[in-house]
């Protein structure tokens, strides 16, 4: 399988029996928005496919439950920080459930790893990769000037001269980032450097270091907005401690816009995932994300939502048609697949998750199924139905062409047809409502 690596700017092969993956989780001070769902569904799609190929995946994700934004939200709502994090962690977990996400093997709130964070930062100081200034600890960028900026293709001097960083007198270099913040605001923790809180950029580096025992992981994923400075700073800390890359492949997905505009509170177009899922089926969002190469920007609008609805409706309509065929005809269903369809699916997925080509394959297969069902060519029909359902399931979509008909459903459908032929329309209408609820009409 090939995936595009942000660091080397080329596709890299990944052919292993065990694959280790890390993805940055949310800061739980608010509901996540639908843009945050893109990397979640991207990794879910990748992991589901890898596991369908018999590959073991170890998937780790963090939860940032210590942050200035959490403190500010607690003050705004006159609540404790724990009340804020409990509320939004619960909402996030419900979002994952509603999206039918394959849960990470480990989902770790960073507040559970303070002592480990303390030791990690202490190691950086001992290696002279970080320095302590009156209880504030900063990473020393200049010690790694040959490496820093490679992931985001940025040069240190350009960043400084462009006035894009805040100048602090206590830092050796204005780009030096905080790995331990001295503060008395909000919940604080004891450390070798005094009371304070760990820096955001150090969380992920620590978890990868600990969970994967200092080894380079296979895939690190996240949105393009995290590429700099967050991922750049993660990478440099791991290099400082171990002298090697934190990840073999960096997978970054593109930005998401709503009706051509970036989501922002000032424009009033921010859509939380909770609100989206209250109005639309989770398959709608999955289908939308599958339409576009994951590295490209994606614009969500009413037309795209309508296209997703039409795709789902095609599946549902065909499912009804197939159920009726099963009731009215005697034949033995095959459990086999159309080998060419499955082959093409795997080719597209292994080519840097080319899901837009997979959707084209699904559309073509739906046309074939519709044609074969009309012709009643049952052997080929069910080869294609089985293949379609396999792909839909592997992509994490909950829709499928239902090929199971119970005796009750069969008897009810035949009774309905008999009553219609007898023109007892009132009774037929009652049965029709039941058949609609069962997905037969």
Swiss-Prot record:
Q: Which GO terms describe its biological process?
A: cysteinyl-tRNA aminoacylation
Binding sites annotated in the UniProt record for ATP: 265
Q: Which domain of life is it from?
A: Bacteria
Mention one GO molecular function. zinc ion binding
Q: Which GO terms describe its cellular component?
A: cytosol
- Catalytically driven reaction(s): tRNA(Cys) + L-cysteine + ATP = L-cysteinyl-tRNA(Cys) + AMP + diphosphate
Cofactor(s) needed by this chain: Zn(2+)
Similarity comment: family membership:
Belongs to the class-I aminoacyl-tRNA synthetase family.
Name-wise, this protein is Cysteine--tRNA ligase
Q: Which organism is it from?
A: Mesoplasma florum (strain ATCC 33453 / NBRC 100688 / NCTC 11704 / L1) (Acholeplasma florum)
UniProt lists the gene as cysS
